[in-house]
A protein has these predicted regions:
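Membrane-interface helix-loop junctions in multi-pass transporters/channels
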Residues: 1-139
Length: 139
């Protein structure tokens, strides 16, 4: 791979990380507002303290990578490296999701920690399958 291709992939990774930060922040803020309204009305949020922003980021990353992979036969040669490895590699945050699940568990919220971890793996896998199927249809 040429030095220019490496540079473009690195820039795409940085752009993906910025997008992750923005998406996670907006989703987290929206969920916090919803939780606050429910609490003011005397109710509980069905999401509890789940880190929903990270779930949304990983779900969309898995779907997008599945879509890209399914479409790869028709994609330009640069697309898998720049978009898959670069942008989506910077955007997805599976390690953060695992740490968040472990933190919930270690804070005495074992059910929430297990639910978060199982939800992340299961739903992310389903999103990747859906992306692969749609990408294959587009190819």
């Amino acid at each position: 791979m040429s030095p220019a291709a490496w540079a473009v992939m690195a820039l795409a990774g940085g752009a993906g990380a910025v997008c992750r930060y923005l998406v996670d922040g907006r989703v987290t803020a929206a969920v916090a507002r919803r939780r606050s309204r429910r609490a003011a009305a005397g109710g509980r949020s069905p999401l509890g303290a789940m880190p929903v922003g990270t779930i949304v980021v990983n779900l969309t990353a898995c779907f997008a990578l599945g879509l890209l992979t399914g479409w790869a036969g028709r994609a330009p040669a640069w697309a898998p490296g720049v978009l898959g490895t670069g942008f989506l590699g910077g955007y997805s945050t599976f390690s953060t999701a695992c740490v968040e699940g472990a933190r919930l568990f270690m804070a005495g919220r074992a059910r929430a920690g297990c639910a978060h971890t199982l939800l992340m793996v299961g739903v992310s896998w389903l999103a990747a399958c859906a992306g692969l199927a749609l990408g294959a249809l587009a190819a």
